């Protein structure tokens, strides 16, 4: 029997890293067959939203989040929201993401800040674009997510510290702007994962995990995820945890963690 404070662990397959060799609608089906409770992805825009909606309905999975476009990936861009002079493009991408997310009944849109010079102009640009995104998302019941991303993998990324994200969310004052707390990124930049999760739970809209340092399956590496998940759900988290990792071997060979973690969470 579950203790009163215990929550059932729920896991979302990140299809930006898993089953990437398949069309997105087929990847959703594979995630359901593997035992995931939901899915999330990066940039679904090459496939009509109706096709994704059909796959979600067929599997009974929800789409936890998608990313707004990140600019010119070939040129190394990693988001536009904090780039002065790119506001029109950033907002067009935000509009596109919100419309797509609403069409597939997704939970959230991740607005990526990008690599900035951290100048006052960049800070103001980011704030203005997030306020715009939150206002546009609100009628659809969508959450806008911001994610601190480590600067070892993405040098110069505008937002890299949890507390900076929380401070920004608090200052903006929109109920539908939340933190996407990626344990992999935060462990690299700051550590102290369990305390940061529980201390900032009110501001967290989604959680992601992967092993540190190799970003592989979450059952190895320096973070002991059974303890992290126990602390997270005991603190009252009711959402999904995104499995955003790069398989060390084949996807199927590395999926043993899923059943183990579900069992630990009362499944």
Model-derived segments and their meaning:
Residues 40, 65-67, 110, 145, ...:
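Conserved beta-strand positions in the central sheet of alpha/beta enzyme cores
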Residues 46-55:
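Active-site-adjacent beta->alpha loops and helix N-cap segments on the catalytic face
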Residues 2-15, 65-81, 110-115, 149:
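N-terminal small/glycine-rich loop or linker at the start of catalytic domains
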Residues 1-12, 17-35, 105-106, 159-181, ...:
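Histidine-acidic metal/acid-base catalytic patches
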Residues 5, 80-178:
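Active-site acidic/histidine proton-transfer and metal-coordination neighborhood
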Residues 37-46:
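A short beta-strand-loop structural module common to alpha/beta enzyme folds
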Residues 17-19, 45, 69-72, 113-117, ...:
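Active-site-proximal loop/turn and secondary-structure-junction residues that shape catalytic pockets
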């Amino acid at each position: 029997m579950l203790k009163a404070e215990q929550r059932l662990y729920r896991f979302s397959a990140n299809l930006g890293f898993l089953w990437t060799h398949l069309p997105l609608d087929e990847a959703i089906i594979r995630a359901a067959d593997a035992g995931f409770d939901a899915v999330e992805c990066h940039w679904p825009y090459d496939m009509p939203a109706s096709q994704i909606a059909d796959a979600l309905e067929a599997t009974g999975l929800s789409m936890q989040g998608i990313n707004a476009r990140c600019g010119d990936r070939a040129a190394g861009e990693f988001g536009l929201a904090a780039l002065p002079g790119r506001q029109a493009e950033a907002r067009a991408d935000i509009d596109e993401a919100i419309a797509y997310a609403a069409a597939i009944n997704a939970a959230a849109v991740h607005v990526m800040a990008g690599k900035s010079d951290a100048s006052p102009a960049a800070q103001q640009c980011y704030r203005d674009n997030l306020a715009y995104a939150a206002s546009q998302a609100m009628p659809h019941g969508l959450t806008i997510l911001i994610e601190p991303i480590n600067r070892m993998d993405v040098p110069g990324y505008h937002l890299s510290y949890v507390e900076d994200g929380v401070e920004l969310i608090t200052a903006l004052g929109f109920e539908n702007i939340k933190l996407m707390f990626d344990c992999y990124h935060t462990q690299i930049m700051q550590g102290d994962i369990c305390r940061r999760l529980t201390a900032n739970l009110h501001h967290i809209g989604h959680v992601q995990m992967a092993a540190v340092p190799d970003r592989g399956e979450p059952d190895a590496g320096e973070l002991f995820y059974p303890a992290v998940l126990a602390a997270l759900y005991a603190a009252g988290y009711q959402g999904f945890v995104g499995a955003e990792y790069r398989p060390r071997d084949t996807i199927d060979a590395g999926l043993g963690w899923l059943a183990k973690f579900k069992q630990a969470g009362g499944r």
